[in-house]
Amino acid sequence: MCYNILQQVIIMVKDLCFEVIEKCLNNCKFCSSNSNCNKTQIIEFDTFKKVIDYFISTGGIGELSISGGEPFLHPDIFKMIEYSKSLGIRTVVFTSGVIEKDTPEDYRTLLNEQLQDRLREIDMYEPDNEFLRNIVISTYRSYLSGKYDSLSKDTLMYLKRIGLDKIVFDYQGYEYETDCMLMGRGQESRVALLDSLRNASSVGLDVDVHFVPMKPNYKEIGEILKILEIANVKSISLLNFIPQGRGKQNKDELQLSQEELDEFLLLVDKYEKSFPGHIRKGILLQGENDHKCNAGLEKLDIKFDGTVLPCPAFKELSEDECSKFNIKLPNIYTNLEDVKIPGKGTRVKPLCKQIYNRRNST
C-alpha cells in the first residue's frame, strides 16, 4: 500500500530547462528570447535554490539545463552548478562561449604605464619610427579596449572538477560574414567562441555544439564539422529553426525553403560518413512522426521572468491560446506550488504544433 501511495505522489521532472539570465553579449537574429547586452532580468540564487528544492521534494529532476541569455554572465552561475550537482542532478550548461573581459583597474593602470614607457623609449632611440610607434599604440589599445573574452581553461577545468556533465555551445557560422550577421557580433567575440570551444574540449569536458540550419549558414555545415574535428569535439546537434522572438521578426530571411532543407539533408548525409563524432538529428531531421513530444509531461522550461512553460517552443504562444488546450502557465514567484506534471508520457504530435496549427486555421 505504501508503495502505491509513493507512486502517486513522487513525480520526477525528467528535463528541466532553467533560463537564469536574460542578458547576452550577442544579438542573434534568431534568438527566441530577444536577449542582448542591455537586458536586465535575472534569477537570483535564492530563487533558483527554492525552485530546485521544490522539484526535488516532489520527485526529483532527471536533467537540469541552465541557459539564458548567457549563463556565464550570471554572478552565481558556479554556485548554481555546484548546488545542482550536490543533489545528484545531471547538469548541462548552454552557452555562447562569449563572456565579458574582466580587466581589473590596477591592471589597466599598469598597461597604460607600460604604454607610456614604450613610447618614451621610442622617442629616445627611434624618434622617426612612426611605424613602430603606431604598432605599439594599437597593440596596447587592443589590450585596453577589448570587451569580450573566452571561457578559460582554468574556468572549464573547475567546471569539470565540480561535476558539470556537459557544456553546449552555439556555433552557427563558419565564415566571418555569416557569423557576424547571424550572431550580431564581431571578430573578437567570434574568436572567443572558438577559444572557448577548444578549451572545453582540451580539459576533457563533454562538449556538444548546437547548429540551426538557416538560409545564410546551411551550406557551411561541412566546414563547421571540420572545425569540430580539429577541436576534437565529438558531438553536434542539428536543431530546427523556431520562429520566436527575433527569429519571428526575421523569419523570411532565415527559414529554409523545402528545397533548401532537402539540399541541407543531402549535405548532412554526405559529411556524416567522414565525421568521426556523432551527429544528433533533432526534430528537423527525425520527421514529425518520429519525434515524441514530452512538453509539460516530463519536461518544463522556466523563463528568466519566472514563467513556467511546457517547453521552450511555447515562448510565442499567448496565455489565451494555451488555456484552450488546458495549459496553465504558473510563475515561480507567485504560485510555484501549482507547477505539477504527470512525470511520464509522450505525444505523437507535438503539442506546440497542435496549437500553431489551430492558430493558422482560424
Task: Give residue ranges: language-model regions.
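Short, intrinsically disordered, charge-biased short linear motifs at domain edges
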Residues: M12-E19, P276-K281, T334-I341
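Short cysteine clusters
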Residues: C24, C28-C31, C293, C311, ...
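Alpha-helix N-cap/loop-to-helix initiation residues
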Residues: L73, E100-K101, M214-Y218, K328
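Residue-level signal for mature regions of secreted extracellular proteins and peptides
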Residues: C17, I21-C24, Q286, F304, ...
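Radical SAM enzyme [4Fe-4S]-AdoMet core and its adjacent flexible, acidic
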Residues: Q7, I11, R90, N112-G146, ...
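Flexible mid-to-C-terminal extensions adjoining Fe-S/redox cofactors in radical SAM and related proteins
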Residues: I5-I11, N34, T307-V308, P312-T362
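Conserved alpha-helical substructure of the radical SAM core
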Residues: C2-R161, D165
